[in-house]
Amino acid sequence: MVDFQLPLPGLARDFNELTKQEKDFIAYFSAIDMDSISPVVDCYAGIGPKGYNVFLILARIIKIKERILSDRQLAEVLRKNDLYRFVTKDIQPAHNTFNTLRKRLGPDGFVEIHKRFVLKAHSLGLLEPEIPDLPKHRKKGIILVADSTFLITCGSTKGEKDNQGRWRFKDESVAFTGKGHHAHKYPVGHKAHSLKTVNGVPMATIITAASVYDQKAILPLLDELTGRYPDLPFAYIILDRGYDAEEIHQDIYEHFGIIPIIIRKKMVYPKGFTKDGFPFCPWGTPMKPKGIEYDRKRTKYACFKTCQESEQMLPICDYLKEQYRFGYICHTYFTNGYRKFGPALPHNAIYQKLKPLRTGIERTFGLVKENRYRMEETNFYKGIDNVTIHTVEHDIVLTQDIIFDYLTTGKKSPVLKLNY
């Protein structure tokens, strides 16, 4: 907790008169690293009256945390609430100042601010927490989770059909879905596609029309991720069965060097394999995995001489001899099919450990759906750029939430139970 002198300059009340919630609010904003903001806003002239600079960004953070719906409402509460005035150094911008801020910074400016918050989290060890249950001999790096959510826009329910029966909206970047998502039985505008670390830190978000399928967005999303953080190591990405297509398995691994943990649909293996994908030895005994050779893009299997334990031994098998330590050995190659023979198969230990984490994260954290200050319900902006900024602001706040929790409690994740 941050120590303050009493009374606090600019605060209408004595610090001791504040509630615990109000003290925590001040501590939260005092913990924000201004070096994550000031280098960005200093590059843009005219984002507001002289002296506003970083404090306009703090005001945007207040908007997200307090679930303030519009710029006009934000400008009004900044004038009336002494806590808000204190943490923003008593700035009192007009509502159109925030519109100027968005135009001058643009999506790229807000993305750069978020990037600096993420790198701050990385310096604290929050992107790669040690997860004790994972295999020790795994690829080292950041574990990612991807998901998407619909965003209702202020123009999405005011569409009109043209002569060809197509929907037209005042905001041309939105789309209309006649059937709707299983959780959204109403017209929607945009879709936010997000990548998070397995412990909940948002890494990147892109916005598309709601009609764009998740499969079409995952590669551009990974392009955005690796472009933002070229020096960070990414090891695995956990995806649901909606992404289970051969080209996605292959492209993620080949283009980005990330191992996809994709929940599989039903698979049928060719002759010579068990129904679970284990190859048979020449004498019909199921083999066991011995390791994955990523550099050679293959998985090694061995029989481990299990037939010796069988009542019907095979005396003709030369691989029972002493010089064959693990018995008969064979390989499957990624290039023969990444879904069936790729770098992370359903029977691999890392797959079995990471797969349940996705379900747990969705339930506990809701990814972009529930615990992001109702991002999908609080968007009142038109245009792809403004909607993108809206989502990036939520990413900034959520990243700072995790940083603040770590600084005050030592907790590295709001979604994983890490016993250390």
Predicted regions, residues:
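Basic, short loop/linker segments at the boundary and entry of helix-turn-helix/winged-helix-like folds
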Residues: 16-67
